[in-house]
């Protein structure tokens, strides 16, 4: 199946784009949703997280205490790597299981840290970045989450720089503060149609998909 890696900084609108692609028939696998399920009450990652970070990492309902973890990552630079070492193998396993069951027109992996991970380029046929300016990112995240601007900037600082994401992109969907919902939908539809054509070509004899040797 033809594979798209969809990414973008926090607040860029990649989830909105993913919802549109799913509406049009793509199979969408969201790494963030998998991560949240793994760290929800009873999630598969929670026993290992409790062992690694102690009971203070677990909220009263048994989920990951995200506010506590954000603060720890800010104070202790190694904490992010320790958490990712626990989560990433599980996310990878669940991602592969979901991909094996996908039956859509093509497959979309929504991965916030796709560019940063370095391992996705060989797993997808194209990388699409949903792009917007930092001020718009901050405003959107503040509106939906109530996080302070310094907290949002810390999250942004842990992600790839905007220029780095754009350099890695095969396709870009601009979703800045001036982009209306209709305009965003039109931009996403243009790429959806392009990917459908590419998926069709890749499925023909002699066509190529990600991971296929030259």
Curated annotation (Swiss-Prot):
Reactions it catalyzes: 3'-dephospho-CoA + ATP = ADP + CoA + H(+)
Source organism (scientific name): Bordetella pertussis (strain Tohama I / ATCC BAA-589 / NCTC 13251)
UniProt domain DPCK: residue ranges: 3-202
Primary subcellular site in the record, as a coarse category: cytoplasm
Annotated disulfide bonds: none
This protein's record includes keyword Lipid metabolism: no
Subcellular localization, as worded in the UniProt entry: Cytoplasm
GO cellular component labels: cytoplasm
Pfam families in alphabetical order: CoaE
Keyword flag Metal-binding: no
Family of the protein in this entry: Belongs to the CoaE family.
Pathway the protein takes part in: Cofactor biosynthesis; coenzyme A biosynthesis; CoA from (R)-pantothenate: step 5/5
Enzyme class (EC, first level): transferase
Keywords of the record: ATP-binding, Coenzyme A biosynthesis, Cytoplasm, Kinase, Nucleotide-binding, Transferase
GO molecular function annotations of the record: ATP binding; dephospho-CoA kinase activity
Protein name, as recorded: Dephospho-CoA kinase
EC number of the protein: 2.7.1.24
GO biological process: coenzyme A biosynthetic process
């Amino acid at each position: 199946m033809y594979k798209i890696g969809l990414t973008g900084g926090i607040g860029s609108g990649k989830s909105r784009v993913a919802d549109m692609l799913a509406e049009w028939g793509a199979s969408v696998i969201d790494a963030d949703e998998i991560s949240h399920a793994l760290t929800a009450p009873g999630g598969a990652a929670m026993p290992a997280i409790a062992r690694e970070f102690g009971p203070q990492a677990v909220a009263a309902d048994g989920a990951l205490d995200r506010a506590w973890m954000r603060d720890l990552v800010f104070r202790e630079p190694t904490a992010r790597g320790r958490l990712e070492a626990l989560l990433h193998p599980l996310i990878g396993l669940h991602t592969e299981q979901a991909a094996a069951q996908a039956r859509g027109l093509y497959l979309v992996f929504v991965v916030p840290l796709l560019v940063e991970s370095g391992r996705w380029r060989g797993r997808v046929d194209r990388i699409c970045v949903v792009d917007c300016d930092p001020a718009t990112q901050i405003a959107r995240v503040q509106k939906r989450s109530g996080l302070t601007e310094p907290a949002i900037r810390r999250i942004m600082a842990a992600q790839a720089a905007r220029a780095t994401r754009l350099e890695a992109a095969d396709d870009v969907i601009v979703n800045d503060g001036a982009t209306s919902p209709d305009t965003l939908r039109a931009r996403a539809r243009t790429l959806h149609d392009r990917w459908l054509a590419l998926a069709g070509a890749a499925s023909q004899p002699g066509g190529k998909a990600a991971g296929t040797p030259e």
